[in-house]
């Protein structure tokens, strides 16, 4: 079964993409079937200068488990943001300080202070490079490198939805007013521009070893 292209990122466009020495291009592919609960991914770090035989249109697979495993082609306009760990990765003392601080902030936006930090400040929703995983569907779990034991860091988040849970849409990207969906996409959804669906609407995090990116990566659904 041929693997499908999922993302192609150039280091020149994505400041947080820490490419291994001698490479400046990351290509992410996956198998469009669950292994066992989400597509299995493969990472290829390359030098863009060596990529000369370029396909205009990637081949579609003869079969796939779900339509949501065939990404719609998209052009990226990277936007750098600052985010913070999910509240579940913070100490109990810091969680309480954040809860108290969030009360007046949440009141101004008519939001629940219990969820204000996670919705508005901690994790940027959508597809992203680097950053922190959201733990709204499972508890935090250790992510040691299977080769050397180093704590792994998120390389790429593949998300079902681009928008967050706050009504103020604090994480909405800066949009190019002239940008419009391709005329070929009669079902374009700005909240899901890639049309990818992970599980019942979750995220698939790909994490790599910061000490040696060539070590096997791990995958996690949240």
Each predicted region: which residue ranges?
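Preference for intrinsically disordered or flexible, low-complexity segments
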Residues: 1-222
């Amino acid at each position: 079964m041929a693997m499908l292209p999922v993302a192609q990122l150039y280091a020149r466009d994505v400041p947080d993409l820490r490419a291994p020495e001698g490479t400046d291009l990351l290509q992410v592919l996956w198998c469009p079937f669950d292994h066992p609960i989400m597509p299995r991914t493969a990472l290829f770090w390359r030098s863009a200068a060596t990529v000369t035989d370029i396909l205009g249109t990637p081949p579609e697979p003869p079969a796939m488990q779900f339509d949501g495993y065939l990404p719609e082609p998209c052009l990226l306009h990277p936007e750098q943001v600052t985010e913070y760990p999910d509240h579940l990765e913070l100490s109990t003392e810091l969680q309480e300080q954040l809860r108290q601080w969030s009360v007046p902030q949440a009141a101004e936006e008519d939001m629940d202070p219990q969820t204000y930090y996670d919705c508005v400040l901690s994790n940027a929703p959508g597809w992203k490079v680097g950053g922190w995983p959201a733990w709204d569907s499972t508890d935090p779990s250790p992510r040691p490198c299977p080769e050397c034991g180093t704590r792994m860091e998120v390389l790429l988040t593949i998300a079902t939805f681009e928008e967050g849970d706050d009504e103020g849409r604090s994480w909405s990207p800066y949009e190019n007013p002239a940008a419009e969906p391709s005329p070929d996409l009669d079902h374009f959804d700005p909240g899901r521009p890639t049309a990818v669906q992970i599980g019942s609407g979750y995220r698939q995090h790909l994490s790599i070893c910061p000490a040696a990116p060539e070590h096997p990566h791990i995958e996690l659904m949240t």
